[in-house]
Amino acid sequence: MDRGKMNVSLPTDLIREIFARLPSKSVARFRTLSKQWASILRSTDFTKLFLSRSSNRPRLLFAVERYKCNEWQFFSSPQSQNRYEKSAHLEFHSKFSGDVSHYICSYASGLLYFPAVHIVDTETIVICNPITGMYTGLPVIMKDRRSRGFLVFDPVDKRFKAFDTHFILTLGSGELKWREKNIPCPLYERCSSNQGICINGVLYYLAKTVLVETVFGLTFLIVRFDVSSEEFKFIDAARFNDRLKDPTRLSLVNYMGKLGVTDCNCVDAGGRRTVELCLWVLEDVEKLEWVKYVYTLPENEVLASCEFSVAGVTATGDIVLCMKYTCKPYYVFYFNPEKKTLQTVEIQGFGAKLEEVENRGEVFAYVDYVEDLSLNDAKQLKSSISHVKSLCPCCQKLVQPENIGEVV
């Protein structure tokens, strides 16, 4: 038999199973090799299968901000599913430069929202897919400079929405246009250092109001925004007022489908420094019933001596803490509240520059990241954001809202 003429035809189901185990970037490359593969790998059935397989291997997503270089870099690593894992390797995905403003980003279902990125002398709101680097710009709105905005996902209509103060923009609705929402609510100011959290189609974020007199003249409240109905509710959060001077200590998390608030502090335990973690869980959102848990983490010299933040809570219930700045070695910590165990995993691969003290970057980490091919195929996202620094004024139309393509 002439092996050069040998033609082996694989069943379509087998092709789907093989490719569903690959990274999304590899799938994108194989789509270009033949019309048959492109048809299979762009089908709705394969997109659903890929998402199902990807959900079984969640990752940690890292967005690293380098102030000195005006640059964001995006990495991901396997999320620990084995108590005996000691290290994990990063995969670099994309980056963008161009006078990055020191504003915190917002994350929702695989996309990142940046409220102020300077591109070609223009301040632009940018939504970016950190894996592919594809992005789009949104119309700029007149608002309070302290406002930061959020990106949220509507699980009912399967659409993303951008939300800033009382303005809402729906992606996938044709023209990208902000709508103003009149809200009968107390005068409040969002805590700009807090990213908020979206849980089952409801956005929660921390804010301050002056309605109730306190020793500081302010009190905390939590704003609750239903993404589908676009209705607001307000949750009394005065129990956190002793953190008013430093709200950065508080993190909102998705704790097993319920709103959680965490606060970490180093304490002296028998002459040794250790970390105390407080967790409040909103057990009943209608009755506003909170349950508080206090954990003293197992002794860990690295954790007790470094700056860290709470990245979130995994679907399996592990509370993930990560070092706040890149360095070598860099660690992520998994605390299991039920077993009272603390797992330390070294994250390798930020690169020599980011690991230098003088060039370190601030790390924003997100748990349970899952690759979704439908995000990679979104026509509204344009060319790679890594190229924005090279845009000249005559190419500025690439990021202007009126020139954004049709929406899927």
From Swiss-Prot:
Which SMART domains does this chain map to?
Answer: FBOX
The record places domain F-box at 4-53
> Which InterPro entries would you find in this protein's record?
F-box-assoc_dom_typ3 (IPR013187), F-box-assoc_interact_dom (IPR017451), F-box-like_dom_sf (IPR036047), F-box_dom (IPR001810)
**Where does the secretion signal sit in this chain?**
none
Name of this protein:
F-box protein At3g57580
Tell me what organism the protein belongs to.
Answer: Arabidopsis thaliana (Mouse-ear cress)
Q: Which domain of life is it from?
A: Eukaryota
* Transmembrane portions of the chain: none
Output the SUPFAM superfamilies linked to this UniProt entry: F-box domain
Q: Which NCBIfam families match?
A: F_box_assoc_1 (TIGR01640)
Query: Which Pfam family would be a valid example here?
Result: F-box
